[in-house]
A protein has these predicted regions:
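Short beta-strand element of the alpha/beta-hydrolase
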Residues: 66-78
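Short beta-strand/loop motif that positions the catalytic acidic residue
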Residues: 217, 223-225, 229
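C-terminal catalytic histidine-bearing segment of alpha/beta-hydrolase fold enzymes
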Residues: 238, 245-289
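Short amphipathic alpha-helix adjacent to the substrate-entry channel of hydrolases
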Residues: 86-104
Length: 289
């Protein structure tokens, strides 16, 4: 039998003290998530990855809520070239147990889907889910977009660059806030991965950086970052927070000890009961803008 202290240490190693989020790490979090949460898969387009999972909000004893619940649309990471919504089922189940409707979309991945097409996918999923979320008990006045790592980058573009949701006939005003977990928002194209994904004409590189699209009308924002992150430089969070403050947009920051997985790892079952990250994100989601 694995004792709780041993399990906590293992999960801390896998999710908090690593340089990235691998299949093994995600599998560990899924393994210990034992809740039975109603899940529905929905197609938002015709592509094989144009689908999202919906997790119904639960009350304190595990029953589906009967009153409208806040909604969190969570975009997974994976360096724009890997990852899957089912690998993050534990995040959807955690959000549901916190009393939220959780929507986890897949999106096209590199190299078959290039920038900005994968951002278009997420915008399409956001608009589609927002239009239907009352079917699953969601409160349309409280729909927060959240992402981790590359998913935070994509989600930030959808949240701040109004052109993406405009192609879906709507605006970022349908959202009540943005939460970024260890996200890339203001970076140099100084690695093979980043050049392969984003480099090109100046306008393309400009459009790849969420920090360029902050305005006084931008969504209120909560940013979470590990102080020792070596996968995404913490300067990304500092730069975005500074731009938001300059535009007088409400922004909160949570800085914690740990590396790249620590922000999303807070939602793992063994962590979330005492996590400041989870507590503050939950309060942010529940708040009425």
């Amino acid at each position: 039998m694995i004792r709780p202290r041993m399990l906590r240490s293992l999960l801390a190693l896998l999710l908090g003290a690593t340089t990235g989020c691998t299949t093994i790490q995600l599998g560990a979090a899924n393994l210990i998530e034992t809740a039975e949460v109603p899940r529905t898969e929905v197609a938002y387009g015709e592509g094989p990855r144009q689908r999202y999972d919906v997790y119904r909000a639960l009350d304190s004893i595990g029953r589906p809520l009967t009153t409208p619940a806040p909604v969190v649309i969570f975009v997974h990471g994976g360096s724009w070239e890997s990852g899957d919504k089912r690998g993050y089922a534990w995040v959807g189940e955690a959000l549901a147990q916190l009393g939220f409707v959780a929507v986890l979309p897949n999106y096209g991945l590199m190299p078959s889907t290039r920038f900005p097409e994968f951002v278009d996918d997420v915008a399409r999923a956001v608009a589609h889910a927002r239009a239907r979320v009352t079917e699953w008990g969601g409160d349309t006045s409280r729909v927060v977009l959240m992402g981790h790592s590359a998913g935070a980058h994509i989600a930030a573009l959808v949240a701040y660059d109004a052109r993406y949701l405009a192609t879906q006939g709507t605006t970022p005003a349908i959202l009540s806030g943005f939460v970024g977990l260890s996200g890339a928002y203001d970076f140099l194209f100084d690695t093979k991965l980043l050049r392969r994904t984003f480099a090109g004409p100046p306008e393309r590189e400009h459009d790849a950086l969420p920090v360029h699209f902050v305005t006084p009308r931008s969504l209120r924002t909560l940013l979470v970052m590990g102080e020792d992150d070596r996968t995404v430089n913490p300067r990304n969070t500092r730069s975005l927070a500074a731009a938001l403050r300059k535009a007088q947009v409400p922004v909160e920051e949570i800085w914690v000890s740990g590396t790249h997985g620590v922000s999303v790892g807070a939602f793992a079952r063994i962590n979330r009961g005492e996590s400041e990250i989870v507590r503050r994100i939950a309060a942010f989601v529940r708040a009425t803008p």
